[in-house]
């Protein structure tokens, strides 16, 4: 079994999954990076999966699909941005040879955003970041993102490893600590991330349980987070969690 990632651009990740002679690439935004990742492991992926349709995640898809003869899978909710060969809408699971993945629709960052679960790992695209969540400035809807966080994401097992589409961990953790200055878990995670960056390494993945200890968007009821939302938008303080989530996302947009 192979699970690996490669950074491209400033902070994007593409991922490789392989088992039993079958392999897939996830979010090959840069064709050279994606093909090099597959070549480094001596595999020829037959499938390309997308967490969502933004160009920094799909920009290399056509070239990689041509080079490998690979089939492209993605959620039809983002069909205005790209056209997958196989629509994941309505599919809770997908079997790709020896690879069996669970598909969790999480609209918000884009209409067709999904989380891909494989062997205890959760590929979260731009929906759930380490210590943060994706913005909704490019075709998204913060109210729908709130529903995804409060519904399907809240129900997922805490032991799942979180593998996002970008490494925004340091600025996200700085924002989290601005809301909760005494957050020991966030401070420890930031030190870990900064040490990895200083050594030229990639940060270790977190888990959903770890995210629930540091990520403000999973901590709406924490006193520091609730107080920050109340200061920024007093009318949201007494509202339900979805309204507080939207207010927190707006606060993060201004940070």
Swiss-Prot record:
This is Hydroxyacylglutathione hydrolase. Thiolesterase that catalyzes the hydrolysis of S-D-lactoyl-glutathione to form glutathione and D-lactic acid. GO terms for molecular function: beta-lactamase activity; hydroxyacylglutathione hydrolase activity; zinc ion binding. Its EC number is 3.1.2.6. It comes from Anaeromyxobacter dehalogenans (strain 2CP-C). HAMAP family: Glyoxalase_2. Pfam families: HAGH_C, Lactamase_B. SUPFAM superfamilies: Metallo-hydrolase/oxidoreductase. Coiled coil: none annotated. The lineage of its organism: Bacteria, Pseudomonadati, Myxococcota, Myxococcia, Myxococcales. Monomer. GO terms for biological process: antibiotic catabolic process; methylglyoxal catabolic process to D-lactate via S-lactoyl-glutathione. Zn(2+) 1 binds at residues 52, 54, 109, 126. Gene3D superfamilies: Ribonuclease Z/Hydroxyacylglutathione hydrolase-like (3.60.15.10). Keywords: Hydrolase, Metal-binding, Zinc. SMART domains: Lactamase_B. Signal peptide: none annotated. Binds 2 Zn(2+) ions per subunit. Its cofactor is Zn(2+). Zn(2+) 2 binds at residues 56-57, 126, 166. Pathway: Secondary metabolite metabolism; methylglyoxal degradation; (R)-lactate from methylglyoxal: step 2/2.
């Amino acid at each position: 079994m192979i699970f690996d990632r490669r950074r491209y651009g400033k902070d994007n990740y593409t991922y490789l999954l392989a088992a039993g002679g079958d392999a897939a690439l996830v979010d090959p935004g840069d064709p050279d990076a994606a093909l090099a990742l597959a070549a480094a492991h001596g595999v020829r992926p037959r499938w390309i999966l997308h967490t969502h349709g933004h160009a920094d995640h799909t920009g290399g898809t056509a070239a990689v699909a041509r080079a490998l003869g690979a089939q492209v899978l993605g959620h039809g909710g983002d069909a205005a941005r790209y056209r997958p060969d196989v629509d994941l809408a309505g599919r809770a699971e997908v079997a790709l040879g020896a690879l069996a993945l669970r598909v969790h629709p999480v609209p918000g960052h884009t209409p067709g955003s999904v989380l891909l679960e494989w062997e205890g790992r959760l590929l979260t695209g731009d929906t759930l970041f380490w210590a943060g969540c994706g913005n909704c400035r490019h075709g998204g809807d913060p109210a729908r993102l709130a529903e995804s966080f409060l519904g399907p994401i809240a129900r997922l097992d805490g032991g799942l490893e979180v593998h996002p589409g970008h490494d925004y961990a340091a600025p996200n953790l700085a924002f989290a600590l601005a809301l909760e200055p005494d957050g020991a878990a966030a401070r420890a995670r930031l030190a870990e991330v900064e040490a990895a960056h200083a050594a030229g390494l990639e940060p270790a993945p977190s888990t959903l349980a770890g995210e629930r200890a540091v990520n403000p968007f999973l901590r709406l009821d924490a006193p520091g987070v609730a107080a920050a939302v109340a200061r920024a938008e007093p009318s949201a303080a007494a509202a339900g969690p979805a309204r507080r989530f939207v207010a927190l996302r707006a606060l993060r947009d201004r940070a």
